[in-house]
Regions:
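Glycoside hydrolase catalytic-domain context in secreted enzymes
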Residues: 1-123
């Protein structure tokens, strides 16, 4: 359902009356497995989500994949947290999955301070 909603939302915002131009650029966020602000001494800046490959494929990737491939989303924002010990903004999934497997052609941006978190917060 999230993939369908994301696809239609993206098409509605990006597609204007003239097919030669993008009306707006939709940025999908937050890549990936971002769901914590502050809990038990962890914050979004230092949290490491431990996720299996199955959970990625079953839970986290489908909505992003559908919106990239069917909705032609032109932006993706990586999140503050790490996934399986790798900060999301430095994760090879940005190239191996997003660009190579799914054919994403748009831009990738970080959330505010997420790149600095790579060396300041993630150990």
């Amino acid at each position: 359902m999230n993939g369908i909603f994301g696809t239609e939302y993206t098409k509605g915002l990006q597609n204007g009356q003239d097919d030669r131009y993008v009306q707006a650029v939709v940025t999908l966020k937050h890549w990936d497995a971002y769901s914590l602000e502050d809990s038990g001494g962890f914050t979004r800046h230092n949290f490491d989500a431990i996720i299996s490959n199955f959970t990625f494929a079953d839970t986290y990737f489908p909505a992003f994949k559908e919106t990239v491939q069917q909705g032609n989303a032109l932006g993706v924002m990586c999140s503050y947290n790490s996934v399986n010990g790798v900060p999301t903004c430095a994760n090879s999934f940005l190239n191996s999955v997003l660009r190579k497997e799914w054919g994403f052609q748009g831009y990738i941006t970080s959330d505010t301070g997420a790149v600095a978190d790579i060396y300041k917060e993630h150990k």
